Design a protein with these regions (language model features):
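Canonical Rossmann dinucleotide-binding motif of NAD(H)/NADP(H)-dependent dehydrogenases/reductases
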Residues: 2-33
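The beta1-alpha1 cofactor-binding region of Rossmann-like NAD(H)/NADP(H)-dependent oxidoreductases
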Residues: 39-40, 58-69, 104
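Conserved mid-core segment of classical short-chain dehydrogenase/reductases
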Residues: 89-108, 127, 131-137, 157-160, ...
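Catalytic Tyr-X3-Lys loop
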Residues: 100-120, 144, 168
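Residue(s) in the substrate-gating loop at a strand-loop-helix junction
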Residues: 148
Length: 255
């Protein structure tokens, strides 16, 4: 599938990895719906990018909100060919801490946004993609999810986050198999330490120390590098049902 003239929804598209992906896809001729809870940032980015970008204020875990983002893509641009799930939240809380056991409400919220929200967008996007005409290779769409290296080597205090991202890893292959009959591919990227709004808000010395943890290149990953992998996945039809670590060979320590 080519990016040019294809229609994409990017969740979490107003900042970080999502915004980097939106910028690259628009630059290569894609038509984008930026789906995010941050209205100000999303509207600003859409205005900056012009006619080939729209913003939808979106709570990915809410069916009506998620469906509205998908419907905007179809009504504004005539269909849907790609979904990139970047929306997510981070939480740090130990299973048993000084104040007692991990709050169940906070665990559920991380799962709801990161895992349930991703699946919610996948199922609704797949429905829209399946209605489209296939290309010459029989392909109707591609879905790219965002997991994390925490799915494989989660640190102390990351039980909820690692569980949510591990769920994304675990559902990648079965969903790819489910959607193969519809000509829809499903892939997952598991990023390491990247330049996100949260990390860029840390002191420079902390950012530098985190970057040095990466074997090579010894720095934080850049949103444009994540976006470049998304583009390659879109354009390479044999990539399906797999998880790619994008992490500079880092393996996280326990804490």
């Amino acid at each position: 599938m080519q990016v040019r003239d294809s229609v994409f929804v990017v969740t979490g598209g107003a900042s970080g990895l999502g915004a980097g992906t939106v910028r690259l896809l628009v630059a290569n001729g894609g038509k984008l719906v930026i789906a995010d809870v941050n209205k100000a940032a999303g509207e600003s980015l859409a205005a900056e990018l012009g006619a080939n970008a729209r913003f939808a204020e979106t709570n990915v875990a809410d069916e009506a909100s998620a469906r509205a983002a998908i419907e905007l893509a179809v009504s504004a641009f005539g269909g849907l060919h790609g979904l990139v799930n970047c929306a997510g939240i981070v939480a740090g809380e130990k299973t048993l801490g000084k104040e007692g056991p991990h709050a169940l409400a906070s665990f559920k919220r991380v799962i709801d946004v990161n895992l349930v929200g991703s699946f919610n967008m996948i199922r609704l996007a797949a429905e829209a993609m399946a209605k489209g005409e296939p290309n010459a290779g029989g392909e109707r769409g591609v879905i790219v999810n965002t997991a994390s290296v925490a799915a494989f080597d989660g640190q102390m205090g990351q039980a909820a986050y690692a569980a949510s991202k591990g769920g994304i890893v675990g559902m990648t292959l079965p969903i790819a198999r489910d959607l193969s009959r519809n000509g829809i591919r499903v892939m997952t990227i598991a990023p390491g330490i990247f330049e996100t709004p949260m990390l860029l808000g840390m002191p420079p010395e902390v950012q530098e120390a985190l970057g040095k943890m990466v074997p090579f290149p010894s720095r934080l990953g850049k949103p444009a590098e994540y976006a470049a992998l998304v583009q390659h996945i879109v354009e390479n039809p044999m990539l399906n049902g797999e998880v790619i670590r994008l992490d500079g060979a880092i393996r996280m320590q326990p804490k």
